[in-house]
């Protein structure tokens, strides 16, 4: 069943001779529970694509459907609710609040949405993240890999249908990178959440169900990984 559909997506910065076409007529769809890796060189349009899918940046033209809704027909208030409740964003930089402990950083999206954390859900999430004994630690008391686990927890606390990860292992060593990808894959499988991950690492991309290659704002390949 389809969760995401991107139709004729274009994004242009500037105008005239100085215009930069970050995305040029991009179209594809992703099924519920699918794990898709998006690869391409720096400046190819990968991050722009992810931000538009997540409702963070607006397209110049084209449409993005998530679970049947064209998200760019929503007003600002409804689009903000969509971002909070339907999308989990994970970045290369952890963006944790330094004065909040692990538990507080993870549950922050719920509080911003005027909802109370469910203790059983939080305990299960902390356990899966391997952070149960770190729940009261501040970010500066954690390793880079542990901080990225917190950012993953923060992205997952709302049980989003769509997880978007932009180079989530970019600041980590090889072991921590492998652990993070395994963790994302585990959540993808356990909760049947759709995962779109940007990476420069070919070995990481091969762990996905499918690889989409982008260059100069266009899809150059779209292939299913056969195992």
Which residue ranges define each predicted feature?
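ABC ATPase nucleotide-binding domains
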Residues: 226-227
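H-loop (His-switch) and adjacent beta-strand-loop-beta switch element
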Residues: 211-223
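ABC family nucleotide-binding domain
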Residues: 2-214
């Amino acid at each position: 069943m389809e969760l995401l559909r991107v139709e004729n997506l274009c994004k242009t910065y500037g105008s005239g001779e100085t215009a930069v076409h970050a995305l040029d007529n991009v179209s594809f769809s992703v099924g519920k529970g699918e794990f898709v890796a998006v690869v391409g060189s720096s400046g190819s349009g990968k991050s722009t694509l992810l931000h538009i899918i997540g409702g963070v940046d607006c397209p110049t033209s084209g449409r993005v459907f998530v679970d049947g809704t064209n998200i760019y027909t929503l007003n600002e208030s409804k689009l903000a609710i969509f971002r909070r409740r339907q999308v989990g964003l994970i970045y290369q930089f952890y963006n944790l609040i330094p004065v909040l402990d692990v538990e507080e950083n993870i549950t922050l999206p719920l509080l911003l949405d005027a909802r109370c954390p469910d203790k059983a859900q939080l305990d299960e999430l902390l356990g899966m993240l391997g952070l149960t004994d770190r729940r009261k630690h501040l970010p500066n008391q954690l390793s880079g890999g542990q901080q990225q686990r917190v950012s993953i927890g923060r992205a997952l606390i709302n049980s989003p249908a769509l997880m978007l990860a932009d180079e989530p292992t970019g600041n980590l060593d090889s072991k921590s990178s492998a652990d993070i990808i395994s963790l994302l894959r585990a959540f993808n499988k356990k909760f049947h959440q759709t995962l779109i991950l940007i990476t420069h690492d070919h070995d990481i991309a091969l762990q996905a169900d499918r690889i989409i290659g982008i260059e100069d704002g266009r899809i150059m390949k779209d292939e299913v990984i056969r195992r």
